[in-house]
């Protein structure tokens, strides 16, 4: 049996967790730059993953605490996908990936790190972005720091979609 191994995620798995839901707490803090919240819509928000599978790994989550896809309200589901489309545009123009994975892990057994608050992963991909480093050195190479990626994607968001950049400031 083959196993998928992501040793760089160990930091996330072993980190001390604050009580309550990460997504709810982070959205309420209103410290978007510090928390890497790239964008806030009416029903959903976009956040950079602190433990990325690749540079530019984004997550889109509803503000409302909901753990099941079938429990999302129609307006949440619609906005989640519209914002995801915008994220793909800014990733393509800002980071120039050769492909993009979109996916949800529904439930703990499917691999969800935060199983009780639904979120969509958007992961840019490049030819050869998987290599021997995670296996031999237990290290995942992410070539650009989170703060630089945040600034770059924020700039792309403002360039591509003026409507979104004028909504509630993300630099609180």
Q: What are the functions of these language-model segments?
A:
Residues 1-172:
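HIT superfamily nucleotide-processing domains
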């Amino acid at each position: 049996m083959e196993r998928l191994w992501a040793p760089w995620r160990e930091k996330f798995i072993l980190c001390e967790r604050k009580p309550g839901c990460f997504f709810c707490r982070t959205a309420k803090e209103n410290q978007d730059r510090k928390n890497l919240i790239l964008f806030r819509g009416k029903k959903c928000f976009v956040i950079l993953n602190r433990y990325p599978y690749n540079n530019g790994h984004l997550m889109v989550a509803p503000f409302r605490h909901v753990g099941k896809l079938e429990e999302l309200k129609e307006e949440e589901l619609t906005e989640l996908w519209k914002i995801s489309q915008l994220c793909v545009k800014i990733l393509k123009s800002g980071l120039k990936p050769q492909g993009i994975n979109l996916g949800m892990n529904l439930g703990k057994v499917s691999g969800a790190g935060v199983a009780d608050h639904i979120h969509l992963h958007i992961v840019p991909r490049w030819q050869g972005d998987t290599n021997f480093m995670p296996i031999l050195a237990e290290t995942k190479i992410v070539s650009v720091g989170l703060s630089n990626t945040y600034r770059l994607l924020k700039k792309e968001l403002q360039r591509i979609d003026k409507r979104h950049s004028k909504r509630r400031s993300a630099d609180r």
